[in-house]
């Protein structure tokens, strides 16, 4: 005969508790205990709060069961020669889910050194030549032209 290995999955204690108490996961909302003297609007709000609280509890129980029972299950190999226990671990138990890194930022535009150097070298000086021009044309000469000469500003 050829060697045949048989594997059996043995549940953890938490799995057994969950299978024995399925009503803990599904809890119907009962509004019989509400006082009849309360207004209808108040009763609706209170029942909504109870439902939300129950849903949160159910979600927490499910998460605890799923997280706790994943890594604790064991596979057992029944072989004639050597019984071996192999712990089952989830695929991504050691790795932590990280958000992807942000894309690199676009660098700010820096004016090139060539252009900046040109502005530094060109020390531009604006000269006020209005006085020199007026000195070239005295007021006595301007009266002869009939005030046809006008000052222009740049």
Curated annotation (Swiss-Prot):
Compositionally biased intervals (Low complexity): 24-37
Q: Where is this region: Disordered?
A: 1-111
A molecular function (GO) held by this record is: protein kinase inhibitor activity
Keywords from the UniProt entry: Cell cycle, Protein kinase inhibitor
Return the Basic and acidic residues bias intervals. Answer: 74-83
The job of this chain, per UniProt, is described as: Probable cyclin-dependent protein kinase (CDK) inhibitor that functions as a repressor of mitosis in the endoreduplication cell cycle.
Q: What is this protein called?
A: Cyclin-dependent protein kinase inhibitor SMR14
Q: What organism is this sequence from? A: Arabidopsis thaliana
Q: Which gene encodes it?
A: SMR14
